[in-house]
């Protein structure tokens, strides 16, 4: 696909950021699902670099994958295995079984993966305060973990115009995910060495069973099409960290996290005049509880964040000869409730109401295309950015978030052009409330 780079479930669209990926109209919420999708199962792939308002305000690009619908009756199955060798080996094995009768398709899938990652990082950090500090670090990191992912569900075609289905997707780490970071750090103050550390940090993450469920319905009634999807996700993690410097214990911590997500989306489309009208609603409810305990290097934290996102959208696309015009508007209501140790924090619990417009025009002639678009993008801070927990990096560095962060707003204009396999993109982006990280002396 043009403009797409990346691998192993991590993809970027040049100039648009991380894409939202759909398989047969269903949003992919777990990137390991892409690892389990085999190339010979894909019927078609489409990239949308100017997503309409049916997609969230933070979506800069969309990749839509359609798989081959298996035909025939009775039982079928497949087995696959992948192996790759870098500094460490990575293996992946899976099995898939299908039973089809009439319009009913029942499927069971299982996937086992063994992952070994090895990285080397060399960094230098300068801090200018009452003294000038330099921190030079060479660090080697090794991560090992094993995972199991399963999938059980069915699809049912009532007739050629209607279908529905459900799937349940459990998964877990087999044992702990173990990460070892080991390296040296040289600390200079005003050009003079004040410390030389040999640091060792070990992290063990135990993931309980995560669970996901999805249901869908797609139907056509006359000129109207109805597409409905609903999702549920649950996951929990327990992370323990141990750090030492020059063979002496310096810090320990533990972190327990629970996540819930409920989401639903309804999309209706119908022809209108010479074009197509689309409108619908989208709702997302999340609940995250994060408990952080430490050995005295900072403060314990007990944060809970509940978020409600309600959206309504409408757009209209109109083909006019070699031109295609799209205009749409999305309304988003976002409410956040932030709790510290069970107490609601009013000043950290904002409510936002935003209008998200999208407009584009595209010209296509033979092997040429030209496109001009303008849209608003809104990026909400991640949970890690909002946390009040102070986590250990090394003897001299700690890291924390900011519960007072507000959404980052972009007004972006794009010009795209292409001829055969040659593509060109130019963009202008005006950003408000831009996120950044900074270093300051401890208080």
Spell out what each predicted region is.
Residues 24-52:
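Short acidic/polar hinge/loop motifs at secondary-structure boundaries
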Residues 119-131, 177-194, 238-247, 289-297, ...:
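Outer-membrane beta-barrel translocator domains and adjoining extracellular loop/strand segments
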Residues 202-204, 301-307, 347-350, 378-431, ...:
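Outer-membrane beta-barrel signature, preferentially recognizing the C-terminal barrel domain
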Residues 149-175, 197-341, 364-369, 424:
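Face-selective signature of the C-terminal outer-membrane beta-barrel domain
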Residues 1-27:
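Extracytoplasmic beta-strand/coil segments of soluble accessory domains associated
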Residues 9, 32, 47, 58-80, ...:
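N-terminal periplasmic accessory domains that precede
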């Amino acid at each position: 696909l043009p403009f797409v780079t990346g691998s192993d479930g991590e993809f970027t669209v040049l100039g648009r950021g991380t894409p939202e990926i759909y398989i047969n109209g269903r949003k992919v919420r777990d990137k390991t699902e892409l690892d389990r999708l085999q190339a010979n199962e894909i019927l078609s792939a489409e990239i949308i670099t100017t997503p309409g308002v049916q997609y969230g305000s933070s979506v800069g690009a969309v990749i839509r994958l359609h798989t081959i619908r298996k035909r025939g009756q009775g039982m079928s199955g497949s087995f696959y295995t992948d192996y790759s060798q870098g500094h460490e080996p990575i293996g992946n094995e899976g099995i898939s079984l299908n039973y089809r009768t009439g319009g009913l398709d029942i499927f069971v899938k299982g996937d086992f993966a063994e992952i070994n990652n090895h990285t080397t990082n060399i960094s230098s950090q300068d801090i200018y305060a009452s003294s000038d500090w330099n921190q030079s670090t060479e660090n080697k990191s090794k991560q090992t973990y094993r995972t199991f992912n399963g999938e059980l569900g069915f699809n049912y075609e009532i007739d050629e115009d209607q279908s529905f289905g459900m799937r349940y997707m459990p998964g877990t780490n087999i044992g702990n995910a173990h990460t070892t970071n080991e390296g040296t750090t040289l600390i200079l103050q005003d050009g003079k060495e004040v410390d030389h550390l040999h640091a060792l940090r070990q992290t063990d993450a135990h993931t309980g069973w995560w669970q996901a469920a999805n249901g869908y319905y797609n139907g056509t009634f006359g000129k109207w099409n109805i597409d409905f999807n609903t999702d549920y996700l649950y996951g929990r993690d327990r992370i323990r960290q141990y750090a030492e410097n020059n063979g002496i214990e310096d810090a320990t911590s533990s972190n327990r996290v629970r996540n819930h997500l409920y989401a639903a989306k309804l999309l209706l489309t119908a022809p209108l005049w010479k074009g197509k009208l689309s409108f619908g609603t989208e709702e997302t409810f999340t609940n995250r509880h994060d408990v952080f305990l430490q050995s005295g290097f900072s403060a314990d934290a007990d944060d809970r964040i509940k978020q409600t996102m309600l959206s309504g959208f409408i757009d209209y696309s109109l083909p006019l000869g070699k031109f295609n015009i799209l205009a749409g508007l999305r309304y988003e209501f976002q409410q956040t409730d932030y709790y510290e140790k069970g107490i609601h924090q009013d000043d950290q619990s904002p409510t936002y109401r935003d209008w998200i417009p999208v407009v584009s025009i595209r010209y296509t002639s033979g092997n040429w295309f030209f496109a001009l678009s303008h849209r608003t993008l809104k990026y909400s801070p991640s949970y890690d950015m909002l946390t009040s927990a102070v986590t250990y990096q090394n003897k001299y560095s700690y890291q924390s978030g900011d519960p007072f962060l507000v959404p980052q707003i972009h007004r972006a204009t794009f010009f795209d052009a292409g001829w055969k396999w040659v593509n060109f993109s130019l963009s202008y982006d005006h950003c408000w409330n831009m996120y950044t990280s900074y270093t300051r002396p401890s208080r």
